[in-house]
């Protein structure tokens, strides 16, 4: 008890000298721990007469409280200093030049699809989709493609079994739309299609977009005008366009569409035709009342022509040196 004031003074001095929270905690243990100097003072109470013990205990507790308050104050001071130091170290120098954020870009084929969808959207076409794993009815039979047609051969088509396959065209979307919707119909059907072929101008998977209009009094003139306007818009120039007679099982008459290239040669860009009456009958539409036209085009081919790409496979190799050109 006689050294109590000295212990408090010694504790406060040690507290003030503590340079961090860890050192401060060592001081706390030294003076207020289970075997601390001030804690042990309580054991001296047994040496005092019973009537003096309460007053002496109060004095010891007061000394411990002074030390605890000093500990709390110093801890707050040290923590505040540490926080200020950390904030100072993390301060952002706004005068430093910023780091440039690298912007991404759309894949060139995606850019082509978006551009075509935008054009036909302004003409009132809606986008329709369908399954990539198709049955032979929607991929072939309903489209007036007979069983002996070469497209059904194993070397041209990826078959799962006798009736299921990876679709070879998005025409099945047209069939499903006509099965579930009465005319007037005006859709485009973009999507992935699959054919067993791989070379400089063919890949096993590629993107196709087909269009379909079914309504009363639709003529080949409507088809020609629509596609002529589309091609001029897509290539952003007034093109020389020709419609060359062709054959597709699902259209009659049918045509291939060519544009005159800068080298003075005709370039094939898409196929089209008037919807075959048998196709309309297959989906329950009366060909005596309604007519329509359809067209189909490869997205990769149009992208190659628009941007001057010579190898179709470049679209699938993910070479950033190639893709960065289209940002």
UniProtKB/Swiss-Prot annotation:
Residues noted as binding Mg(2+) in the record, renumbered to the chain: 252
The EC number(s) this enzyme carries: 6.1.1.20
Cellular component annotations (GO), alphabetically ordered: cytoplasm
GO biological process: phenylalanyl-tRNA aminoacylation
InterPro entries documented for this protein: aa-tRNA-synth_II, aa-tRNA-synth_II/BPL/LPL, Phe-tRNA-synth_IIc_asu, Phe-tRNA_ligase_II_N, Phe_tRNA_ligase_alpha1_bac, Phenylalanyl-tRNA_Synthase, tRNA-bd_arm
Cofactor note: Binds 2 magnesium ions per tetramer.
Reaction it catalyzes: tRNA(Phe) + L-phenylalanine + ATP = L-phenylalanyl-tRNA(Phe) + AMP + diphosphate + H(+)
Major site of localization recorded for this protein: cytoplasm
Example of a GO MF term: ATP binding
Localization per record: Cytoplasm
Pfam families in the cross-refs: Phe_tRNA-synt_N (PF02912), tRNA-synt_2d (PF01409)
Cofactor(s) needed: Mg(2+)
Keywords: Aminoacyl-tRNA synthetase, ATP-binding, Cytoplasm, Ligase, Magnesium, Metal-binding, Nucleotide-binding, Protein biosynthesis
Family statement drawn from the similarity comment of this UniProt entry: Belongs to the class-II aminoacyl-tRNA synthetase family. Phe-tRNA synthetase alpha subunit type 1 subfamily.
Binding partners and assembly: Tetramer of two alpha and two beta subunits.
Protein known as: Phenylalanine--tRNA ligase alpha subunit
Originating species: Klebsiella pneumoniae subsp. pneumoniae (strain ATCC 700721 / MGH 78578)
Gene that encodes the chain: pheS
